[in-house]
């Protein structure tokens, strides 16, 4: 349990994938998944909610890569099927920063991506 009494899981990934072209993609991620609701109703997974925080780094053998940082916890409602809030900054190497914003809590498939001050809405 964390300091707030919530169950949490540390998730670490360190892997490499080889594409059919022979190029490799390396991925390293360190995340914390905090169970914010539904932990006492083990037979009803649809009332579960999680906050996810952390970082990720991806690199390509042909050059380039990216880093990702959760700047506001990504909130998942299992019964919804989509992230409902949270912000991630994705910094591709030699490219502008991308800010992904999942909104303010509404269960919908809408999110925005901001690049160079331009915001694009996806749903």
Q: Where are these predicted regions, by residue range?
A:
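Extended terminal
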Residues: 91-123
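Short polybasic amphipathic segments
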Residues: 13-17, 54-58, 86-90, 108-115
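An extracellular/secretory-lumen and virion-surface interaction module
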Residues: 20-24, 85, 117-122
């Amino acid at each position: 349990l964390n300091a707030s009494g919530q169950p949490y899981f540390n998730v670490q990934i360190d892997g490499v994938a080889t594409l059919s072209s022979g190029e490799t993609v390396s991925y390293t991620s360190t995340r914390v998944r905090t169970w914010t609701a539904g932990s006492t109703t083990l037979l009803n997974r649809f009332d579960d909610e999680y906050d996810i925080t952390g970082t990720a780094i991806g690199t390509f053998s042909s050059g380039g890569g990216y880093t990702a940082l959760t700047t506001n916890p990504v909130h998942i409602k299992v019964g919804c099927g989509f992230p409902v809030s949270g912000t991630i900054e994705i910094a591709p190497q030699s490219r502008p920063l991308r800010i992904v914003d999942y909104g303010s809590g509404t269960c919908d498939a809408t999110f925005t991506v901001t690049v160079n001050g331009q915001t694009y809405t996806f749903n």
